[in-house]
Protein backbone atom coordinates (compact mmCIF):
# COMPACT_ATOMS: atom_id res chain seq x y z
CA UNK A 1 0.00 0.00 0.00
CA UNK A 2 1.49 3.32 -1.02
CA UNK A 3 1.04 6.08 1.53
CA UNK A 4 2.45 8.75 -0.80
CA UNK A 5 4.28 9.07 -4.10
CA UNK A 6 7.50 8.11 -2.38
CA UNK A 7 6.83 5.91 0.66
CA UNK A 8 5.71 2.33 0.58
CA UNK A 9 3.92 1.13 3.68
CA UNK A 10 4.94 -2.49 4.15
CA UNK A 11 2.76 -5.09 5.82
CA UNK A 12 5.22 -6.76 8.11
CA UNK A 13 2.94 -9.79 8.27
CA UNK A 14 3.75 -10.38 4.62
CA UNK A 15 7.47 -9.98 5.26
CA UNK A 16 7.87 -11.72 8.62
CA UNK A 17 6.42 -15.15 9.28
CA UNK A 18 4.44 -15.83 12.47
CA UNK A 19 4.02 -12.18 13.35
CA UNK A 20 0.53 -11.10 14.32
CA UNK A 21 1.06 -7.36 14.75
CA UNK A 22 1.51 -4.98 11.87
CA UNK A 23 4.37 -2.56 12.44
CA UNK A 24 4.50 0.87 10.91
CA UNK A 25 7.63 0.16 8.90
CA UNK A 26 8.39 2.32 5.87
CA UNK A 27 10.79 1.49 3.06
CA UNK A 28 11.03 4.57 0.81
CA UNK A 29 10.92 3.68 -2.86
CA UNK A 30 13.53 6.22 -3.89
CA UNK A 31 16.24 5.35 -6.45
CA UNK A 32 18.93 7.23 -4.52
CA UNK A 33 18.20 5.19 -1.40
CA UNK A 34 18.49 2.01 -3.44
CA UNK A 35 21.71 3.28 -5.01
CA UNK A 36 23.45 4.17 -1.74
CA UNK A 37 22.27 0.95 -0.11
CA UNK A 38 23.87 -1.02 -2.95
CA UNK A 39 27.12 0.92 -2.50
CA UNK A 40 27.10 0.19 1.23
CA UNK A 41 26.37 -3.52 0.75
CA UNK A 42 29.28 -4.10 -1.64
CA UNK A 43 32.19 -5.72 0.21
CA UNK A 44 34.61 -3.98 -2.18
CA UNK A 45 33.44 -0.49 -1.20
CA UNK A 46 36.33 1.28 0.59
CA UNK A 47 35.77 2.69 4.07
CA UNK A 48 35.61 6.34 3.00
CA UNK A 49 32.96 5.62 0.34
CA UNK A 50 31.05 3.33 2.70
CA UNK A 51 30.85 6.15 5.23
CA UNK A 52 29.61 8.55 2.54
CA UNK A 53 26.96 6.06 1.43
CA UNK A 54 25.71 5.61 4.98
CA UNK A 55 25.60 9.37 5.49
CA UNK A 56 23.53 9.79 2.35
CA UNK A 57 21.15 7.08 3.52
CA UNK A 58 20.78 8.87 6.84
CA UNK A 59 19.87 12.08 5.05
CA UNK A 60 17.31 10.60 2.66
CA UNK A 61 15.67 8.39 5.28
CA UNK A 62 15.37 11.30 7.70
CA UNK A 63 13.83 13.44 4.99
CA UNK A 64 11.15 10.78 4.50
CA UNK A 65 10.67 10.18 8.23
CA UNK A 66 9.99 13.84 8.98
CA UNK A 67 7.73 14.50 6.00
CA UNK A 68 4.43 14.68 7.95
CA UNK A 69 5.86 14.68 11.46
CA UNK A 70 7.53 18.00 12.17
CA UNK A 71 5.26 20.62 13.78
CA UNK A 72 4.85 23.76 11.68
CA UNK A 73 3.54 27.29 12.08
CA UNK A 74 1.87 29.42 9.42
CA UNK A 75 2.71 33.08 9.08
CA UNK A 76 3.28 35.85 6.53
CA UNK A 77 6.59 37.04 5.07
CA UNK A 78 7.60 39.97 2.93
CA UNK A 79 9.18 39.01 -0.40
CA UNK A 80 11.05 41.59 -2.53
CA UNK A 81 7.72 42.20 -4.30
CA UNK A 82 4.85 41.64 -1.87
CA UNK A 83 3.65 39.83 1.22
CA UNK A 84 2.71 36.16 1.05
CA UNK A 85 1.83 33.24 3.29
CA UNK A 86 4.68 31.11 4.64
CA UNK A 87 5.15 27.95 6.71
CA UNK A 88 8.06 27.32 9.05
CA UNK A 89 9.07 24.42 11.27
CA UNK A 90 7.92 25.44 14.75
CA UNK A 91 11.09 26.50 16.62
CA UNK A 92 9.36 26.12 19.98
CA UNK A 93 8.83 22.37 19.57
CA UNK A 94 11.99 20.54 20.72
CA UNK A 95 13.64 17.91 18.54
CA UNK A 96 16.22 15.42 19.75
CA UNK A 97 18.56 13.15 17.79
CA UNK A 98 19.78 10.03 19.60
CA UNK A 99 22.63 8.28 17.76
CA UNK A 100 23.40 4.80 19.07
CA UNK A 101 27.18 5.01 19.44
CA UNK A 102 29.20 4.08 17.63
CA UNK A 103 27.54 3.01 14.37
CA UNK A 104 24.83 5.66 14.69
CA UNK A 105 27.48 8.36 14.39
CA UNK A 106 27.87 7.41 10.73
CA UNK A 107 24.39 8.79 10.04
CA UNK A 108 24.59 11.84 12.28
CA UNK A 109 26.24 14.50 10.09
CA UNK A 110 23.67 14.43 7.30
CA UNK A 111 20.77 14.02 9.71
CA UNK A 112 21.88 17.20 11.48
CA UNK A 113 21.78 19.02 8.15
CA UNK A 114 18.12 18.04 7.79
CA UNK A 115 17.40 18.95 11.43
CA UNK A 116 19.94 21.69 12.22
CA UNK A 117 18.21 22.95 15.38
CA UNK A 118 17.91 19.50 16.98
CA UNK A 119 19.77 18.65 20.18
CA UNK A 120 21.99 15.55 20.07
CA UNK A 121 21.94 13.02 22.91
CA UNK A 122 24.55 10.27 22.58
CA UNK A 123 23.70 6.78 23.80
CA UNK A 124 26.57 4.30 23.82
CA UNK A 125 25.61 0.63 23.68
CA UNK A 126 27.84 -2.37 23.11
CA UNK A 127 26.76 -5.92 22.32
CA UNK A 128 28.40 -8.92 23.95
CA UNK A 129 29.64 -11.11 21.10
CA UNK A 130 28.79 -14.32 22.99
CA UNK A 131 25.40 -13.59 24.52
CA UNK A 132 24.42 -10.91 21.96
CA UNK A 133 23.02 -8.90 24.89
CA UNK A 134 23.64 -5.12 24.98
CA UNK A 135 25.07 -3.05 27.80
CA UNK A 136 25.22 0.73 28.18
CA UNK A 137 28.55 2.52 28.63
CA UNK A 138 27.47 6.10 27.75
CA UNK A 139 24.16 7.82 28.43
CA UNK A 140 23.77 11.53 27.66
CA UNK A 141 19.98 11.51 27.80
CA UNK A 142 18.39 14.06 30.15
CA UNK A 143 16.63 12.88 33.29
CA UNK A 144 13.34 14.00 31.72
CA UNK A 145 12.42 15.17 28.24
CA UNK A 146 9.88 17.84 27.46
CA UNK A 147 6.92 15.52 26.66
CA UNK A 148 6.44 17.26 23.29
CA UNK A 149 9.98 16.44 22.13
CA UNK A 150 10.26 14.65 18.79
CA UNK A 151 12.99 11.99 18.94
CA UNK A 152 14.94 10.57 15.99
CA UNK A 153 16.96 7.45 16.88
CA UNK A 154 19.88 6.60 14.60
CA UNK A 155 20.60 2.86 14.59
CA UNK A 156 21.95 1.66 11.22
CA UNK A 157 21.41 -2.05 11.89
CA UNK A 158 18.24 -3.41 13.52
CA UNK A 159 19.41 -6.97 14.07
CA UNK A 160 18.62 -8.87 17.28
CA UNK A 161 16.69 -5.93 18.68
CA UNK A 162 18.56 -5.81 21.98
CA UNK A 163 20.16 -2.40 21.52
CA UNK A 164 17.15 -0.64 20.04
CA UNK A 165 14.85 -2.03 22.74
CA UNK A 166 17.24 -0.75 25.41
CA UNK A 167 17.27 2.64 23.70
CA UNK A 168 13.47 2.74 23.53
CA UNK A 169 13.23 1.84 27.22
CA UNK A 170 15.63 4.64 28.16
CA UNK A 171 13.78 7.20 26.04
CA UNK A 172 10.20 6.30 26.97
CA UNK A 173 11.10 6.14 30.67
CA UNK A 174 12.06 9.81 30.38
CA UNK A 175 8.63 10.95 29.30
CA UNK A 176 8.50 10.39 25.53
CA UNK A 177 5.54 8.61 23.96
CA UNK A 178 6.37 6.07 21.21
CA UNK A 179 4.37 7.98 18.59
CA UNK A 180 6.84 10.87 18.90
CA UNK A 181 9.76 8.59 18.02
CA UNK A 182 11.15 7.83 14.57
CA UNK A 183 13.85 5.20 14.07
CA UNK A 184 16.26 5.65 11.17
CA UNK A 185 17.85 2.35 10.16
CA UNK A 186 19.69 1.29 7.03
CA UNK A 187 19.00 -2.45 7.30
CA UNK A 188 16.35 -4.12 9.46
CA UNK A 189 15.77 -7.79 10.29
CA UNK A 190 12.69 -9.65 11.58
CA UNK A 191 13.91 -10.31 15.17
CA UNK A 192 14.29 -6.59 15.92
CA UNK A 193 11.01 -5.69 14.23
CA UNK A 194 9.14 -8.31 16.25
CA UNK A 195 10.38 -6.78 19.48
CA UNK A 196 9.62 -3.23 18.39
CA UNK A 197 5.98 -4.19 17.86
CA UNK A 198 5.67 -3.72 21.63
CA UNK A 199 5.59 0.04 20.96
CA UNK A 200 2.35 1.09 19.25
CA UNK A 201 2.64 4.29 17.28
CA UNK A 202 6.37 3.90 16.72
CA UNK A 203 7.50 4.35 13.11
CA UNK A 204 10.61 2.84 11.54
CA UNK A 205 12.25 4.06 8.34
CA UNK A 206 14.71 1.68 6.74
CA UNK A 207 16.30 1.17 3.35
CA UNK A 208 15.61 -2.58 3.35
CA UNK A 209 14.17 -5.44 5.41
CA UNK A 210 16.54 -8.39 5.11
CA UNK A 211 15.93 -12.11 5.55
CA UNK A 212 17.31 -12.76 9.02
CA UNK A 213 20.42 -13.28 11.16
CA UNK A 214 23.34 -15.68 11.13
CA UNK A 215 24.67 -17.53 14.19
CA UNK A 216 26.71 -14.48 15.22
CA UNK A 217 23.74 -12.14 15.16
CA UNK A 218 24.69 -10.38 11.92
CA UNK A 219 21.98 -9.47 9.42
CA UNK A 220 22.01 -11.58 6.24
CA UNK A 221 22.66 -10.48 3.53
CA UNK A 222 23.16 -7.21 5.41
CA UNK A 223 26.29 -5.11 4.96
CA UNK A 224 28.60 -6.39 7.67
CA UNK A 225 29.59 -4.44 10.79
CA UNK A 226 28.59 -0.85 9.98
CA UNK A 227 30.85 0.67 12.63
CA UNK A 228 33.92 -1.31 11.62
CA UNK A 229 33.44 -0.59 7.94
CA UNK A 230 32.79 3.12 8.44
CA UNK A 231 35.73 3.72 10.76
CA UNK A 232 38.16 1.31 9.11
CA UNK A 233 38.64 -0.93 12.15
Residues covered by each model-derived region:
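PRPP-associated nucleotide enzymes
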Residues: 1-233
